[in-house]
Each structure stands twice: as structure tokens, then as C-alpha cells.
Amino acid sequence: MELKSYVREIADFPKKGVSYKDITPLLLDPEAMRLAVKLFMKNLPHGKIDKVVGIESRGFFFATMLAEKLNAGFIPVRKPGKLPHRTHKENYDLEYGSDSLEIHEDAIKKGEKVLLHDDVLATGGTAAATCKLIEKCGGEIVQCNFLVELEFLKGVDKLKGYDVCSLIKYS
């Protein structure tokens, strides 16, 4: 089974010139989802992972599944104003604009081992901002993993010093 065959490309979405990678066909297929989780688990570094951070909103899908498999807590990183408790905030640039993200201040204890997950690594801005949020909370990032990586945007360059794993790559 080739996971890449479950990703649909949508031209000029969300704006002209962007080739959007739609993972919903993969989400519709239970076997494809199971394979993705199995491959993520196989590529994790050894050792205990305390928390899995998922980035709003498509990062939540696999982050929750990985948290369950790892017997770890799940932490949502969300857009501003969506979390009810005190938060840390980080601004970032993305492929088609700019935004900011928030995490609950008390979501991670100092020294906890954290896995970061998102659906797509594009420019790296979202993931880099989330790494900063995790570190503000005192977490140690063990890996940043992604379902899809757009290698031509060189997002991995913003994640220097972190272990990065992507299951599907577009050159």
C-alpha cells in the first residue's frame, strides 16, 4: 500500500499558485490510517514519550492516535482564543500568509519528552513556532513528525537540531 496514493492534490487552493495536499482520502481508509500510525511508531526514537502535541486542526487526527498508542497525553496547539486557560503564544509565517498559535502554559512539565505531530511540513513556520511553544513550557522535543513533507519549500531547514520524520515526500 502506497500512502502517497491517498493524498489528493488540489491546484490553486487556498490561493492561486498553491498545490494543496488533501489528506482526507487517506482518512477515509482505515487500512491507510493504520499503516500511517504503524510507520510513525516504527520511526520514533526509543524511550518514553510523555506528551504528543498536535497542531490545529489536521494535526489532531494522527496526534491523538499516536498518544493513545504511546500511552501519552495529547496536547492541542490551537489558533488564538480557542484555549480556555492561560496560554503561551507564538507568531509564525506560513506558505500562504501569517498567523499565531497558542498552548496552555501548564500543558507540559519541565523535562517531559514531547512528540510534535502535524499533517504537512511546508515552510516550517508552524512547526518551528510549535517547537518554541513546547520549549517555553519546559518540554524536550524527541521528534517532529509529519504525514506529508513539501521538500521544495525547505521547511526542514527551520527545524535544524530536531529529529524530523515525514512519511510522504513531494520534491
Swiss-Prot record:
Signal peptide: none
Gene Ontology BP, a term: adenine salvage
Compartment list: Cytoplasm
Pathway: Purine metabolism; AMP biosynthesis via salvage pathway; AMP from adenine: step 1/1
Key words of the record: Cytoplasm, Glycosyltransferase, Purine salvage, Transferase
Domain of life: Bacteria
Documented EC number(s): 2.4.2.7
GO cellular component, one term: cytoplasm
Example GO molecular function: AMP binding
Keyword check for Transferase: yes
Described function: Catalyzes a salvage reaction resulting in the formation of AMP, that is energically less costly than de novo synthesis.
Similarity section: Belongs to the purine/pyrimidine phosphoribosyltransferase family.
Database matches in HAMAP family: Aden_phosphoribosyltr
Quaternary context: Homodimer.
Protein name: Adenine phosphoribosyltransferase
Organism: Christiangramia forsetii (strain DSM 17595 / CGMCC 1.15422 / KT0803) (Gramella forsetii)
Lineage, broadest ranks: Bacteria, Pseudomonadati, Bacteroidota, Flavobacteriia, Flavobacteriales
